[in-house]
Amino acid sequence: MLNKRNPQLNAHGELIHLLSIEGLPKAVLTQILDTAGTFLSVNDREVKKVPLLRGKSVFNLFFENSTRTRTTFEIAAKRLSADVINLDIARSSTAKGESLLDTIANLSAMHADMFVVRHAESGAPYLIAQHVAPHVHVVNAGDGRHAHPTQGLLDMYTIRHYKKDFSNLVVAIVGDIVHSRVARSDIHALTTLGAAEVRAVGPRTLVPADLKHMGVRVCHDMSEGIRDADVIIMLRLQNERMSGALLPSAGEYFKSFGLTEEKLALARPDAIVMHPGPINRGVEIDSSVVDGRQSVILPQVTFGIAVRMAVMSTIAGNNA
């Protein structure tokens, strides 16, 4: 039986779908982060396998392009011993006009156990979760501007790995926040986990004003936004989602909001720099920072496998 207040949870408060971080209790987030820690060592084994999803079929449905997310989901499922099916959307019946729900119905008839879904339309994973059988689980791998919960969780794992505790942290999220599903997921996770201060930093055209109602400090000046920050999360400009001229030029944007070593010096000396990728060097961040000692961008990718293993194994073990 589903939880009437949150479709991601069953009546016992256990996670059965991961659709958004918003509304999830701190205990659920902490459980996933703790579980991810136990899976991290699997990456270093000679045989990188555990049998938790043996006999289960995981369908990766990516209606938008992806490198890191799709690959790490596939690796994570295979390391859990699942059978992984990657649907080629461009060559599928979807490209011939088949509806999303008809596609899901047909794949469900093939005894799918889990759908990992990335879609351009916000809410698509919610729609799928409403129409699958009780034993089938749905993981949101990014839907429109709405949410990217596994990226949010791996960002939280990265922060916890390097900073241990959220309670005294100042976290600055810099860039195209208005179009970013990662920013939304990170903000919900950070506030739930008790970060001391969350800042949204960017030009007025790219930072939603309503973030203030979520307890987020909005800064339109880069120096103010990253001063004394413990964590800086850089975001790319999502030009594919922009409908008009929101910025004068990429060069002007970099001058005002690009992270350079000079600007990074305003943050705390032990601050870490994160980025969900893909990175546009020289637009939102300088190469010297990407490759510098404070960058933890590549460890984020490594942690992503363990976090996605934790998500899939957690929801697969819970029944609706």
UniProtKB/Swiss-Prot annotation:
L-aspartate binds at K96, R181, R236. One of its GO terms (molecular function) is amino acid binding. One of its GO terms (biological process) is amino acid metabolic process. Carbamoyl phosphate binds at R68, T69, R118, H148, Q151, G277, P278. One of its GO terms (cellular component) is cytosol. The keyword Transferase applies. Pfam families: OTCace (PF00185), OTCace_N (PF02729). It comes from the Bacteria. It is an enzyme of class 2 (transferase). Keywords: Pyrimidine biosynthesis, Transferase. Its EC number is 2.1.3.2. Heterododecamer (2C3:3R2) of six catalytic PyrB chains organized as two trimers (C3), and six regulatory PyrI chains organized as three dimers (R2). Catalyzes the condensation of carbamoyl phosphate and aspartate to form carbamoyl aspartate and inorganic phosphate, the committed step in the de novo pyrimidine nucleotide biosynthesis pathway. HAMAP family: Asp_carb_tr (MF_00001). Belongs to the aspartate/ornithine carbamoyltransferase superfamily. ATCase family. PANTHER family: ASPARTATE CARBAMOYLTRANSFERASE, ORNITHINE CARBAMOYLTRANSFERASE, MITOCHONDRIAL. NCBIfam families: asp_carb_tr, PRK00856.1. This is Aspartate carbamoyltransferase catalytic subunit. It comes from Methylibium petroleiphilum (strain ATCC BAA-1232 / LMG 22953 / PM1).
